[in-house]
Amino acid sequence: MLNVELPGLSLKNPIIPASGCFGFGREFASLYDLSVLGSIMIKATTLEPRFGNPTPRVAETGAGMLNAIGLQNPGLKGVLENELPWLEQFDTPIIANVAGSQVDDYVEVAEQISQAKNVHALELNISCPNVKTGGIAFGTDPQMAAALTKAVKDVSSVPVYVKLSPNVANIVEIAQAIESAGADGLTMINTLIGMRLDLKTGKPILANKTGGLSGPAIKPVAVRMVHEVSQAVSIPIIGMGGVQNAEDVLEFLLAGASAVAVGTANFVNPFICPEIIEELPNVLAAYGYSSVEECIGRSWKHEALAHHRA
């Protein structure tokens, strides 16, 4: 009842640890078998290694956290030689998150990493708010987003999903531009831009000044955006933003997501993903659903059916 079929991804269940909140899985593999996961979104990979932003770069908030990590990663060579081979021991498809500062960077990383035998899809990171160049610059302009998507699609050996930024005036317009450029799916949402101030100094707590807000605080925004975008495109969506339990997963499915990524909750409870997987069948049954597929987009498909009958 939990299996989901998406472009490039045959998922045993719809639960995926989100990129940036799971590293490359090594720490979590000491706690449970990663093969139970529907898929794994690995940490963003750039062409060259990145050390990220200066510290402090994480701050707790009332209902979540701010981060300004800055895409710290070992670079394409390190991921291809060390991380992906290590992940081959697990029976779960890998989604490689690709980031860069310019189109050529994305293209080179995508072309090479998509050929790794356990990478089943790419997640194009065009929405990171914590880097000075690239990242969110591509995610806030429909034409730039479409051009980058097409460039990556032209070289990728696997389906391409594009990660959407919530820090835009019209997320539907950007989603449609990306779909028109050939994207196979969308992941959404990335973090909202936020800030915390130190009351003693009056200065921002984060060295980067601003950071990406994640956690329960952003879930209503994420659900609303998934609900809107899923009605405007025909490609599948992997929803994310503030998921803490199986009820949250069901809410994203009803809004129109076909699978759900769990991010910040992994920092609070490292067992959260397997716990949600175990809990989900009972939650679906409690609300009268016999499968994940039956839930997808129910919130608006129900309205459309009622309107059609009227």
Swiss-Prot record:
It comes from Bacillus pumilus (strain SAFR-032). Keywords: Cytoplasm, Flavoprotein, FMN, NAD, Oxidoreductase, Pyrimidine biosynthesis. Its EC number is 1.3.1.14. One of its GO terms (cellular component) is cytoplasm. It catalyses: (S)-dihydroorotate + NAD(+) = orotate + NADH + H(+). Catalyzes the conversion of dihydroorotate to orotate with NAD(+) as electron acceptor. FMN binds at residues 19, 43-44, 97, 125, 163, 189, 215, 241-242, 263-264. Binds 1 FMN per subunit. The active site is at 128 (nucleophile). GO terms for biological process: 'de novo' pyrimidine nucleobase biosynthetic process; 'de novo' UMP biosynthetic process. PROSITE patterns: DHODEHASE_1, DHODEHASE_2. Substrate binds at residues 43, 67-71, 125, 190-191. Its main location: cytoplasm. GO terms for molecular function: dihydroorotate dehydrogenase (NAD+) activity. Belongs to the dihydroorotate dehydrogenase family. Type 1 subfamily. PANTHER family: DIHYDROOROTATE DEHYDROGENASE (FUMARATE) (PTHR48109:SF1), DIHYDROOROTATE DEHYDROGENASE (QUINONE), MITOCHONDRIAL-RELATED (PTHR48109). The keyword ATP-binding does not apply. Transmembrane segments: none annotated. Pathway: Pyrimidine metabolism; UMP biosynthesis via de novo pathway; orotate from (S)-dihydroorotate (NAD(+) route): step 1/1. This is Dihydroorotate dehydrogenase B (NAD(+)), catalytic subunit.
